[in-house]
Structures are given as C-alpha cells and as structure tokens.
C-alpha cells in the first residue's frame, strides 16, 4: 500500500552485474589515422592492375659498356656508311633482298665484318622480337679514354681545348659536339659515367666520322675531375644563357675546358660553382636559347678564331689600353 510499502528498488541478481565498460583505448581510432591516401591500383598487391603489371616482362636497363645491336635496314646502312665499328652483321634466312640489304652485305664484306645468316626465329629471340626487318648489326662497346690520359694528350699540344658535358642526355647532341670539336681543333670530350649520353651508334653516325678521331673520356665524378684539371692549369668556363661573361669578352688563347649543360636544366649547381667563369652567347632579342650542340659549336668557333690570330705580347696589349 502506498506509504508503508516495503518494496525496494530493483536489485540485480548476484553474478549478473555488468561492471565498468571497457573500451578499445582509442586503438581503433588511431588505427585509422596516418594511413594517407589510397595508393594507386598498380601498387596494391592484390589488385588486378598490380597483377597485370607484375605479369608484364621487364626490359633490362642497358649499360653503357654493353654490346649494342642496331636494327633495321636504314639504321644499319647508315652505320656502315659512317664507318661505325661493328663485329657482325646478322641476316635472317629468306629475307627479301632490296638495294639497302645488298649494300649492307657488300659494305660489311668490304670492311671485314662477319656476316652471319640465321633463322628469323633466332633473330627474333636475339633482338627481343623488335622490328629488325631481317637484319641487325652488332656494335661493340666504345673504348673510352681515361680523363688523365685525355688531359695529358691535350696539354702536349698547347693550348688545350676540351669540352665537358654536364649530364647531356641526347646521343645526337653528343655526336654533333664531337663533330664540332674535330672541326675547330679541339682535343677531346669528357662525359660523366652516369646519367649521360654515351658513344652509341647514334652518336657515332651524328659525328660524321669524328668519333674515330676525337677521344671521349668518362669521369666517375665530373666535378672532381674538373677540379683536378683546373689544378693543372686548365681554365674551366661554363656555358649558360644567364652567364655573367659575354662570349666576346672571353680570352680563348689559354688552355680551356668548355662545360656544356644538359638540354633542359643547363649546368648543375656544383659544376657551375667550380667554373672560373660562366659564359653566355649574345643573341638577338627574339631568340631565347640555342640547342646544346649548336651553342657548343658557336663557342668553339669563336675560340678557334681567336687562336688563329697572332698572339700579341702582353706588354703591347697593356700599352695600347693605356
């Protein structure tokens, strides 16, 4: 009855007390943090795109000191006409002959290059099924000079004139620069061992035979090699559109090494810092820049023109300036 009821509040039976709630301690929330954006499909191991990427054959990276194989009738014929050194000419049996193929075989025979006939399937395997048109030319690795030997040979014919390439990537530019070095009395070319165009069949063809006369050396560290050359009395001049010295003001009568930067980025920071001066080519306002090989040719031509003039004694030059 109301007022005298002895009923107590609800009592939980013993052994059934819920107790204090226990959470995850934030583990679930923290587990979702810091994962960043979802990676691309080809980087997720179990995604079909990743499986397809793993199934694709990977082409090995070609090293600069490996044998090169030139494929196709026109490229092979150009190499043979340019006198590119080769060890073997491969011709697939049953290949339809034309004037190019006939000339390739004749030039290879005249040059003492081995002519090897093989099944087309074997040539397919040898060239990884590239479009070889039934013919391939094997070119051995280029025999690079040592930087010290290159400098010593140049100093024996003073004043030395060398060209260093700072991560130039196009072998056609390398070949064109070799051609300019030969045309304007230079003694050789220096390239980095890594991240640089090497003397391939493409460079050899572009050089128009200059590769047979102009030595090319490879430096493990281009900056350190240039420092060593500077210590031996060679002046290092960099070539850059933003250079502080105009080409007209450069004294080209001393022993020089002209450093040409890469096609896109120009001179690297360390190489630029170690140049005695950075030279620019005066151009018309409408022209923004020159191709690397063209710029190198312009500078080499200017230096050669200075060296053809009789050198005045320093005293006469100073008296005229006074």
Curated annotation (Swiss-Prot):
MF terms in GO: RNA binding; RNA methyltransferase activity
UniProt keyword annotations, A-Z: Methyltransferase, S-adenosyl-L-methionine, Transferase
CDD domains: SpoU-like_RlmB
Enzyme nomenclature, EC number: 2.1.1.-
Protein's name according to its UniProt entry: Uncharacterized tRNA/rRNA methyltransferase Mb3610c
Superkingdom of the source species: Bacteria
Basic residues compositional bias, start-end: 1-16, 43-61
Transmembrane parts of this sequence: none
Ligand binding (S-adenosyl-L-methionine): 261, 281, 290
Region (Disordered): 1-69
GO CC terms, sorted: cytosol
């Amino acid at each position: 009855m109301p007022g005298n009821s002895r009923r107590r509040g609800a009592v939980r039976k013993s052994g059934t007390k819920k107790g204090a709630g226990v959470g995850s301690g934030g583990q679930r929330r923290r587990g979702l943090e810091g994962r960043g954006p979802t990676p691309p499909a080809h980087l997720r191991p179990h995604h079909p795109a990743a499986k397809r990427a793993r199934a694709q054959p990977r082409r090995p990276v070609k090293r600069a000191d490996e044998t090169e194989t030139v494929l196709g009738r026109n490229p092979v014929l150009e190499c043979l006409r340019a006198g590119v050194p080769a060890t073997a000419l491969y011709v697939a049996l049953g290949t339809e002959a034309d004037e190019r193929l006939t000339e390739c075989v004749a030039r290879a025979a005249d040059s003492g290059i081995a002519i090897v006939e093989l099944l087309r399937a074997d040539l397919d395997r040898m060239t990884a099924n590239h479009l070889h048109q039934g013919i391939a030319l094997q070119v051995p690795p280029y025999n690079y000079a040592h930087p010290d030997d290159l400098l010593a040979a140049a100093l024996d014919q003073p004043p030395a004139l060398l060209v260093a390439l700072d991560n130039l990537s196009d072998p056609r530019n390398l070949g064109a620069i070799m051609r300019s070095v030969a045309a304007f009395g230079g003694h050789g070319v220096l390239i980095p061992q890594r991240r640089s165009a090497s003397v391939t069949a493409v460079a050899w063809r572009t050089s128009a035979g200059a590769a047979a006369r102009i030595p090319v050396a490879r430096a493990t560290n281009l900056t350190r090699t240039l420092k060593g050359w500077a210590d031996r009395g060679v002046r290092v001049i960099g070539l850059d559109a933003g250079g502080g010295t105009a080409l007209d003001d450069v004294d080209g009568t001393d022993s020089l090494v002209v450093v040409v930067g890469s096609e896109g980025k120009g001179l690297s920071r360390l190489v630029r810092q170690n140049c005695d001066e950075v030279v620019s080519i005066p151009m018309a306002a409408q022209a923004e820049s020159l191709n690397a090989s063209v710029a190198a040719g312009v500078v080499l031509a200017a230096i050669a023109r200075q060296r053809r003039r009789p050198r005045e004694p320093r005293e006469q030059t100073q008296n005229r300036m006074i």
